[in-house]
Curated annotation (Swiss-Prot):
Pfam families: Cpn10. Its main location: cytoplasm. Disulfide bonds: none annotated. The keyword Cytoplasm applies. PANTHER family: 10 KDA HEAT SHOCK PROTEIN, CO-CHAPERONIN GROES. One of its GO terms (biological process) is chaperone cofactor-dependent protein refolding. Heptamer of 7 subunits arranged in a ring. Interacts with the chaperonin GroEL. GO terms for cellular component: cytoplasm. One of its GO terms (molecular function) is unfolded protein binding. It is found in: Cytoplasm. This is Co-chaperonin GroES. The lineage of its organism: Bacteria, Bacillati, Bacillota, Clostridia, Eubacteriales.
Length: 94
């Protein structure tokens, strides 16, 4: 079984946040800032606008930066994912 997003939605898996600051302080649990970098694991077919399907700009495997509070968090087969709209993705990291 897999997650297949609809329309212009994208499924991402957050990359782990740094656990140590640049100055060497170890950050725990609630003090960690929510990461905004993720890997794309599934991509919808694109939104339909004026009867035409739009092309998606991201693809599976892309590393992306996304809006801090965007999307809906879901748990699927023991893993945590976020489903968001392509518009909530700010950039592709190369």
């Amino acid at each position: 079984m897999s997650i297949k997003p609809l329309g212009d939605r994208v499924v991402i898996k957050r990359l782990e946040a740094e656990e140590t600051t640049k100055s060497g302080i170890i950050v725990t649990g609630t003090a960690k800032e929510r990461p905004q970098e993720a890997e794309v694991v599934a991509v919808g077919p694109g939104a339909i606008i004026d009867g035409k399907r739009t092309e998606m700009e991201v693809k599976i495997g892309d590393k992306v930066l996304y809006s801090k509070y965007a999307g809906t968090e879901v748990k699927f087969e023991g893993e945590e994912y976020t489903i968001l709209r392509q518009d909530d993705i700010l950039a592709i990291v190369e």
